[in-house]
Regions:
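Short, low-complexity disordered leader/linker segments with a strong preference
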Residues: 1-43, 427, 437-448
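Short, well-ordered beta-strand elements
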Residues: 38-51, 66-71, 95-96, 142
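Extracytoplasmic "Venus flytrap"/periplasmic binding protein-like
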Residues: 59-129, 162-164, 261-271, 426
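A structural signal for short loop-to-beta-strand junctions that line the ligand-binding cleft
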Residues: 93-95, 124-159, 191, 304-307, ...
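Hinge/lid segment of periplasmic solute-binding proteins
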Residues: 101-151, 205-207, 292-296, 376, ...
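Conserved C-terminal helix/tail region of periplasmic/extracytoplasmic solute-binding proteins
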Residues: 161, 245, 386-448
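Glycine-centered hinge/linker elements that transmit conformational signals in sensory
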Residues: 180, 222-253, 298
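C-terminal lobe and pocket-closing loops
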Residues: 278-289, 303-409, 447
Length: 448
């Protein structure tokens, strides 16, 4: 991997700005969706795994005449590995890539993404706060939000009722702890939730607790990694350690496994703290749980209504593209134009305010499964109404590391034993912090 230096970053970003100049010079009318005037810009390559983009790409081609070669080269880290290889090789990179919010800083700071700041004036009014903040780094915009993942509390009402717990009244983590004890009392195999050590979940929960363990200077040269002394990190780890110590969490069932979804159906995994994109996953992979589940707002340490994000992606133009105009037209269409409605109709959770506030979205009571069938998964609840409020509650001041992809990749190496009872969370966090600091220094950052 290429080491980062301020000089290299400056050169890379200068190139990105120059490329953006060529975008403006092309003079295409992206708002009207007119085809690009440059004869050579007839086809763009897009790497993405979001299924609703298939129809969006077809509609975009029909409207603009620009062909889209849409490729799924793997989800999240699998795509990023291929992207890194192509960037390092100097060839083979796409024109547009789906980049999750946590990965934006890592690619922006190395100059791999096109700076589209001057194309997006006023866009903050279009998007919800969390996603809009997440496509920015050091005051610049590097992508357009595609979806969002405000955290929400999904729960099996049937199990909670059996345990005598009203999930709607759980506002604090102390109340959640009390509920965890009551649910586990139903049987040794009943747990309020599961966690085998998930870096994204850890980030979301510490964010929810007000943590700010990672900071990057405006020029991208200095990074602060302060997990061990951050109050928000301590608040969450103290809470979670208590549940681990008392055996109130399922630490054996891996997330996204067949057994995980089975647990949601039979009630042995009674709830989830996860992103608002979860309904379709439940309808498809835990189909027999239909009618049993509901969703409510996240409980917090102090009972406040603040919230955090879990997941969510952007579409970003690669700085190396020679088809910047067409590439930008596509992300504009998909995430700021007609493609937004197409994606929401296909089941995507929106990142824009208009979709989130529309009656048709808020009044939805069914979830579309993979066969396109409407499933009454949440027992008639207007679940999007809850999720839209969750999005409004997101605090947008959390920062990811400029090497967040690496940080999440090695999370389990240092904290895995914390979930098996072989060490405390604090021990794993201290070791992870040192590894992150050492890695940052090795990449050329000044680390504090």
């Amino acid at each position: 991997m290429m080491k980062f230096t301020v000089a290299k970053k400056a050169i890379a970003l200068t190139g990105a700005v120059a490329m953006l100049g060529s975008v403006a010079a092309c003079g295409s009318d992206t708002a009207s969706g007119k085809p690009a005037q440059d004869k050579d810009v007839t086809e763009i390559t897009v790497w993405a795994w979001e299924p609703t983009l298939t129809q969006v790409a077809k509609d975009f081609t029909k409207k603009t005449g620009i062909k889209v070669d849409l490729k799924n080269v793997g989800t999240n880290t699998k795509e990023y590995t291929q992207l890194d290889n192509a960037i390092e090789a100097g060839s083979g990179a796409p024109d547009v890539a789906q980049v999750e919010y946590y990965a934006i800083p890592q690619y922006a700071i190395k100059g791999n993404l096109l700076d589209i700041t001057d194309k997006t004036s006023g866009y903050s009014d279009f998007y919800t706060p969390g996603p809009w903040a997440s496509v920015q780094f050091a005051g610049k915009v590097y992508g357009l939000p595609m979806d969002s993942g405000p955290m929400a509390f999904f729960y099996n009402k049937e199990v909670f009722d059996k345990a005598g717990v009203d999930a709607e009244q759980i506002k604090t983590w102390d109340q959640y702890y009390d509920a965890a004890k009551k649910i586990h009392a139903l049987g040794d195999n009943y747990y309020i939730t599961s966690d085998t050590g998930d870096a994204g979940f850890f980030d979301s929960m510490t964010w929810l607790a007000g943590a700010k363990p990672f900071q990057t200077s405006s020029d991208g040269s200095e990074v602060t990694v302060n997990l061990t002394e951050d109050k928000g990190v301590k608040t969450f780890t103290d809470f979670w350690q208590k549940l681990l110590d008392e055996g109130l969490l399922d630490t054996k069932t891996a997330g996204w496994s067949e057994d995980w979804f089975k647990g949601m159906v039979d009630g042995t995994i009674a709830s989830l703290f996860t992103g608002a994109w979860m309904p379709a996953n439940l309808a498809n992979s835990a189909a027999d749980g239909a009618g049993k589940w509901r969703v409510t707002q996240m409980p917090t340490a102090d009972g406040s209504t603040t919230n955090s994000e879990n997941g969510g992606s952007s579409l970003a133009v690669l700085a190396s593209t020679k088809k910047a105009d067409a590439a930008y037209q596509f992300i504009e269409y998909a995430n700021h134009g007609d493609g937004v409605a197409t994606r929401v109709a296909g089941g995507a959770f929106p990142a824009d305010k208009a979709s989130m506030e529309s009656d048709s979205f808020k009044n939805t009571t069914t979830v579309k499964n993979a066969d396109g069938e409407d499933v009454d998964y949440f027992g008639g609840q207007k679940y999007n109404e809850v999720l839209a409020q969750a999005a409004e509650n997101v605090s947008s001041d959390y920062q990811f590391l400029p090497y967040e992809v690496k940080a999440r990749t090695i999370f389990g190496d240092y904290l895995g034993k914390s979930y098996t009872g072989d060490q405390k969370l604090t021990d794993g966090i201290a070791a992870w912090q040192k590894a992150l600091q050492d890695y940052g220094k090795d990449q050329g950052f000044t680390v504090k």
